[in-house]
């Protein structure tokens, strides 16, 4: 579906007040966010965020740790509120799972190595919580997580202990960051180093001086704001640079998991409908549990519009069975504009079904003319008929309805005029600050020293005389 076909639908969505998440390759994104970002913001009151991986200096920010930091700050203001602490841990676990299993696999698929991936997920959760709790605001981002994990691989000054073990010893015994790292902490040194190396291999893809301008600062529209208010997020994918494609897949996974977490707080269903337009979903790296996403999203008031060029793209990413599950969970299928050698046209012809037609033959002889008629079955539209449909003609298949042949007109023929562009201003290059293991250790030692000083000034004998049991 090209940009001109999507424009009319976006106007309807804007009027309905539905939230939109749109990912597209570069040339299509120029039409979408430049034209429809302005319309959404100026005429319908939408919050608009553009995550442009092609031009990071013209992009809004998207700090993956934003919600963790947000609830960590709230929790620090009132430590008695355990629900805030639970939210911090929940969003940290979402980020860790998304990064460790970003290739679409699950721990069970790694066989004997599943321990390392499960441990890596727990340890990454732990490091995220430590960064969020003990680092200054400008250092709380995903690249700091990489930097800290790298520092933890260094040998420590204490004989027989790694830097990782030394830092964990400085945390209180009941600190959840220490618990999340438990499986890695209580294993052999070689296995521990393997777990840390597994995390580094996953985080290595974030090391990019330009992309840091997106990942290391503020977030324009977080998922809670996105779900609660009218919002549109545009993800721009540079088709010529496949090293950044994984970020699109990663953002989609994180957004979806955070939307589910938010929906659970709202009774299991989002109050505002969310539409995810995923252009080129067949060319970005596989989205973990995509089959489940397509199966379960509708019950959470989330609709997914998957836009592909060929069914073979889905099969390549998700396998034949996974592609079949995704297709089976699509209530509407719109297709047209097939290439002359398209195999997808053959599949779509079969999906349309068959009709019964009258067929026969007539033969004439001198004395015995004969006529033969019979009812036969033929495809509703053959592969050749689908391939030869005029430009702008499409077939719509909808659950519970007969297939429909329709013409989708250009947006101009609907009377839609695009008056202005949504322009992103160029941001100045900002210096990125990173977390330091030594600074975090210094903070932890200072906190422990303060606790020791307080304990020394408590008169336990007076407390005992007051009838309070002290252990």
Residues of each region from the PLM?
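P-loop NTPase motor domains
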Residues: 24, 28-302, 317-320, 384-405, ...
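Cationic, low-complexity basic patches in intrinsically disordered or flexible, solvent-exposed regions
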Residues: 8-10
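Intrinsically disordered, low-complexity segments enriched in serine/threonine/proline/glycine
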Residues: 20-22
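Methionine residue identity
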Residues: 1-2, 6
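Conserved ATP-driven motor cores of ASCE-family P-loop NTPases powering translocation/secretion/packaging/pilus
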Residues: 294-395
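Short, surface-exposed polybasic-aromatic patches that bind anionic ligands, especially phosphate groups
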Residues: 409
